[in-house]
């Protein structure tokens, strides 16, 4: 697994073969960031259910102002630290060990411009998205990775799916608040 583009392009990340660890593939990450394009530059990003940290590190590589990595597994938070060190990333991030579903009552200090969630495929992705949806900035975008076979809802607590991308066994749902016509 490697960083696709940006200042850290080509850096290799550690991705152990743990039961339940399912890193976002290089191909799907490349598709995601091609869609997000300039939206990443200067953004505050939440990489939820972060696993290896690959999505958040890719965001740092492409100019995100700050990335918050959240994962409930101690091994994952340690892995994220190692992967950040491998890439010589010294600042511009926070790593939090927490279960997004259970610990979402603690809001962040500032809203996120981009929220990426990759919950375990056996979890209900909408439950995790609901837990952090209010952390999204007014013009922010929530991206949910889920099993293609199970799908994801068209709307989650006031956020509407604006796009879906399918690749292999995975899919990405892009959610935003509806624009108010005025």
Residue spans of the language-model regions?
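Class I S-adenosyl-L-methionine-dependent methyltransferase catalytic core
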Residues: 1-182
């Amino acid at each position: 697994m490697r960083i696709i583009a940006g200042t850290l392009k080509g850096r290799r990340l550690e991705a152990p073969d743990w039961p339940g660890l399912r890193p976002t593939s290089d191909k799907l990450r490349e598709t995601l960031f091609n869609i997000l394009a300039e939206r990443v530059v200067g953004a505050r990003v939440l990489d939820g259910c972060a696993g290896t940290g690959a999505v958040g590190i890719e965001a740092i590589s492409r100019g995100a102002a700050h990335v918050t990595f959240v994962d409930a597994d101690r091994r994952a938070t340690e892995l994220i630290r190692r992967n950040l060190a491998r890439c010589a990333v010294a600042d511009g991030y926070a790593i939090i060990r927490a279960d997004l579903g259970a610990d979402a009552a603690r809001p962040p200090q500032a809203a996120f411009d981009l929220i990426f969630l990759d919950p375990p495929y056996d979890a209900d992705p909408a439950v995790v998205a609901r837990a952090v949806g209010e952390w999204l900035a007014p013009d922010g975008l929530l991206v949910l990775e889920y099993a293609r076979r199970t799908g994801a809802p068209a709307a989650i607590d006031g956020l509407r799916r604006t796009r879906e991308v399918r690749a292999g066994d995975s899919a990405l749902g892009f959610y935003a608040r509806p624009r108010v016509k005025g």
